[in-house]
Amino acid sequence: MRLHTGEKPYHCFHCDRHFVQVANLRRHLRVHTGERPYSCTLCPSR
């Protein structure tokens, strides 16, 4: 129901972004940490 109410309880401590789902916050935090958990299947890059 948060989607319909506009409630965004999960916020980033590095910037001013807020999220409805904690999974979206975790994905966003990779922007700040530089984490790249998935590797390319065609080359050795991440």
Curated annotation (Swiss-Prot):
The keyword Acetylation does not apply. It is found in: Nucleus. The keyword Zinc-finger applies. SUPFAM superfamilies: beta-beta-alpha zinc fingers. Disulfide bonds: none annotated. Keywords: Developmental protein, DNA-binding, Gap protein, Metal-binding, Nucleus, Repeat, Zinc, Zinc-finger. One of its GO terms (molecular function) is zinc ion binding. It comes from the Eukaryota. GO terms for biological process: segmentation. A zinc finger (C2H2-type) spans 1-4, 10-32, 38-46. Coiled coil: none annotated. GO terms for cellular component: nucleus. Krueppel is a gap class segmentation protein. Belongs to the krueppel C2H2-type zinc-finger protein family. This is Protein krueppel. The lineage of its organism: Eukaryota, Metazoa, Ecdysozoa, Arthropoda, Chelicerata.
